[in-house]
């Protein structure tokens, strides 16, 4: 997670601020906090452009609970773009709408080969996805 955060911080366009462990608090009789692995803020709009949840284990496909988690993160930040980031390409990746307004997809930041290339591929997917709306 920290590696992905640092890589994105160093290579993302200057229009974006990348944050790791972005804490969001809710008051529900008492304070409930969640920590979002990675948020990417669009500095031109002041809005959260993406929420990313990093995963450490390879899987055939994302677990339903992981999708629900990243959707909750997106809702908490008022964000319409959410991604699960895995260390390898998934056999059955996801890409689609959750409800009417949150686009969820699984992406890879491959850790087994050229890390610069893997990072550029992730950044390209985020740029294309964010700049063109999917």
Which residue stretches match the model-derived regions?
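Catalytic core segments in nucleotide and nucleic-acid processing enzymes
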Residues: 1-134
């Amino acid at each position: 997670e920290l590696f992905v955060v640092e890589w994105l911080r160093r290579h993302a366009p200057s229009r974006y601020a990348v944050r790791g462990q972005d804490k969001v608090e809710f008051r529900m009789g008492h304070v409930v906090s969640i920590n979002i692995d990675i948020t990417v803020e669009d500095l031109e709009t002041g809005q959260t452009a993406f929420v990313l949840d990093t995963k450490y284990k390879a899987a055939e496909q994302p677990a339903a609970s992981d999708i629900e988690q990243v959707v909750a993160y997106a809702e908490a930040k008022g964000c319409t773009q959410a991604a699960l980031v895995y260390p390898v390409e998934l056999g059955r990746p996801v890409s689609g709408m959750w409800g009417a307004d949150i686009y969820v997809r699984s992406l890879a930041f491959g850790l087994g080969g050229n890390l610069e290339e893997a990072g550029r591929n992730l950044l390209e997917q985020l740029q294309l996805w964010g700049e063109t709306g999917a």
